[in-house]
């Protein structure tokens, strides 16, 4: 489930993170080629966007959305992350996960994992509690307070604000590929108040698939290869547009 409640004051008054300086564009390598096991052709990756941070939502004592037949969101998105990771790695991307097993890192720990990377995008994975089965939706954060105070500093809980435009571009690309795979999915990314995205200083999206209301978990598992392919295609398509904004500093 994507939409989450607003953070408490204690969650917003966090230590500062450093927003990396703008990336220096470089020309694509001429020694590219199609990977033999790749689901689609990929050129050798130049400097810039090379890291994808995958966030399987929930975990530990938080199962996320639950459906009939023992369906638990936290378990399904962890398996989905493995599929997405394999597909991305075939394209030459480095992949970092916020969790590897049944643990539940805090929102801030998950964001810190992404914020520590350079040249990264962030994708948090969810299963809907009420969505249309068989579809997939991308969300970008809509809860964007002013970017900086009068001194040009950004509080931790507003870290996503300078990246909103890039997140929207990235989200629309991924949503377009998901729509090609899953009939009835939206044409473009939607906006929502997504707590996990708010403190992430990188292009960041939430991908929510199908619904836990399906009769059989196998219905969700069958979507995994298509979701993984769509995300990987979206990342590859976004790569030429990737640049780190020349954002202000961050409020301690």
What is each PLM-predicted segment?
Residues 1-252:
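Catalytic-site microenvironment of enzymes
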């Amino acid at each position: 489930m994507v939409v989450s409640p607003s953070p408490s004051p204690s969650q917003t008054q966090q230590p500062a993170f450093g927003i990396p300086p703008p990336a220096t564009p470089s020309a694509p390598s001429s020694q590219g080629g199609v990977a033999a096991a790749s689901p689609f052709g990929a050129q050798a990756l130049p400097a810039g966007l090379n890291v994808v941070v995958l966030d399987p939502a929930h975990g530990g004592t938080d199962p996320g959305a639950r459906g009939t037949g023992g369906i638990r969101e936290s378990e399904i998105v962890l398996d989905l992350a493995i599929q997405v990771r394999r597909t991305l790695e075939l394209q030459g991307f480095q992949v970092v996960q916020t969790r590897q097993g049944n643990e539940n890192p805090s929102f801030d720990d998950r964001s810190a994992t992404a914020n520590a990377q350079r040249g990264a995008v962030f994708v948090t994975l969810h299963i809907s509690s009420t969505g249309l089965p068989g579809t997939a939706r991308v969300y970008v954060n809509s809860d964007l307070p002013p970017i900086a105070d009068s001194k040009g500093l950004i509080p931790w809980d507003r870290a996503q604000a300078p990246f909103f435009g890039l997140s929207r571009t990235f989200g629309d690309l991924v949503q377009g590929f998901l729509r090609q795979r899953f009939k009835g999915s939206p044409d473009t990314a939607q906006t929502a108040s997504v707590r996990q995205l708010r403190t992430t200083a990188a292009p960041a999206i939430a991908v929510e698939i199908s619904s836990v209301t399906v009769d059989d978990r196998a219905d969700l598992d069958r979507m995994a290869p298509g979701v993984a392919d769509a995300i990987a295609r979206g990342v590859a398509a976004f790569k030429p547009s990737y640049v780190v904004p020349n954002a202000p500093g961050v409020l301690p």
